[in-house]
């Protein structure tokens, strides 16, 4: 069973989604199925079929969440320190071409959200950053071509 690294915040988010799906969404869907079933003929009952599909999707996600939570390797980034980049680090970079600063936190695959500044540990930029420190230069082969960055800051917590 492969462990799935994630931050404490990511782990708590998955647990909250699981709780919501089991305790709120599941009963709502069961009620919708019962209501649609009461309308009679199920063969042409669009509400019934939509509710059954929603149930299938919800149960699939519940199974996925249970698996992720069981395999979670929770890393409390508030207890990490150091001046090199590793899982959980928040890194400030400067693009060598545009001189634009970017800030990213390196997180697990399930909690990555580039718009929020959280990048997956398995992303090209995170892989290039692991083990680097302030002042180091990295080159990332991205879909738009190679980009160069300099590490300005490495923070934890």
Curated annotation (Swiss-Prot):
NCBIfam families: greA, PRK00226.1-2, PRK00226.1-4, PRK00226.1-5. One of its GO terms (molecular function) is RNA polymerase binding. HAMAP family: GreA_GreB (MF_00105). PROSITE patterns: GREAB_1 (PS00829), GREAB_2 (PS00830). Disulfide bonds: none annotated. InterPro entries: GreA/GreB_C_sf, TF_GreA/GreB_CS, Tscrpt_elong_fac_GreA, Tscrpt_elong_fac_GreA/B, Tscrpt_elong_fac_GreA/B_C, Tscrpt_elong_fac_GreA/B_fam, Tscrpt_elong_fac_GreA/B_N, Tscrpt_elong_fac_GreA/B_N_sf. Keywords: DNA-binding, Transcription, Transcription regulation. This is Transcription elongation factor GreA. It comes from the Bacteria. The keyword Transcription applies. Belongs to the GreA/GreB family. It comes from Chelativorans sp. (strain BNC1). Signal peptide: none annotated. Necessary for efficient RNA polymerase transcription elongation past template-encoded arresting sites. The arresting sites in DNA have the property of trapping a certain fraction of elongating RNA polymerases that pass through, resulting in locked ternary complexes. Cleavage of the nascent transcript by cleavage factors such as GreA or GreB allows the resumption of elongation from the new 3'terminus. GreA releases sequences of 2 to 3 nucleotides. GO terms for biological process: DNA-templated transcription elongation; regulation of DNA-templated transcription elongation.
